[in-house]
Amino acid sequence: MTPRGFSCLLLPTSETDLPVKRRT
């Protein structure tokens, strides 16, 4: 798992949540 995906799980409010949600 990439660090970005992991960070999103721990911090859903992170800016990484934006691209991750689009992927799913």
Curated annotation (Swiss-Prot):
GO terms for biological process: negative regulation of execution phase of apoptosis. Expressed in skeletal muscle and testis. Plays a role as a neuroprotective and antiapoptotic factor. InterPro entries: Humanin. GO terms for molecular function: receptor antagonist activity. It comes from the Eukaryota. It is found in: Secreted; Cytoplasm. One of its GO terms (cellular component) is extracellular region. PANTHER family: HUMANIN-LIKE 1-RELATED, HUMANIN-LIKE 4. Keywords: Cytoplasm, Secreted. This is Humanin-like 6. Belongs to the humanin family. Induction: Down-regulated 6 hours following staurosporine (STS) treatment and up-regulated 24 hours following STS treatment. Down-regulated 6 hours following beta-carotene treatment, returning to its basal level 24 hours following beta-carotene treatment. It holds the Pfam family Humanin.
